[in-house]
Amino acid sequence: KTKEQTTMVENPIEYVSTLVGTLSDGSFSAGNTYPATARPWGMNFWTPVTGEMGDGWVYSYDVLQIRGFEQTHQPSPWINDYGQFAIMPVRDAANVSQDARSSWFTHKSETAKPHYYQVYLCDHDINAELTPTDRAAAFRFTYPESTTSGIIIDAYDEGSYIKVIPEENA
């Protein structure tokens, strides 16, 4: 093409889907990726989790249950992860196990971009959104009216640790 025939795209990020390459499992690779939401050169990645916590297969496109949103450093399902943890908004905070807190979702209600992830958690009637920062992420959870809603924080695997310090709001 000549310079005159080249079309400039105004917002190229709109053409990116981080779901590409997520239809993989141990017997077949379609990329072995997960829908990472991260800043360039950020400290960590954030991703929805459809696999069992800590098993290496963080997200599989054909699994329609989200178990949490994980802070991860995982480069590949074959290498696994370290220092990871997950958070999950729930309508009933008494159900803390990963199976009890999981929620069905559909890809029609999922937006997966490098700078933004959003999904509607059908079982909890919660809309979850996240956007990365250099060292963490900002979340927005839209809950139905309820007195039992909450957020589960799960340091679920070896090498992970979380300490909540209420008096320091940290």
Briefly describe each language-model feature range.
Residues 5-170:
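Accessory carbohydrate-recognition regions in carbohydrate-active enzymes
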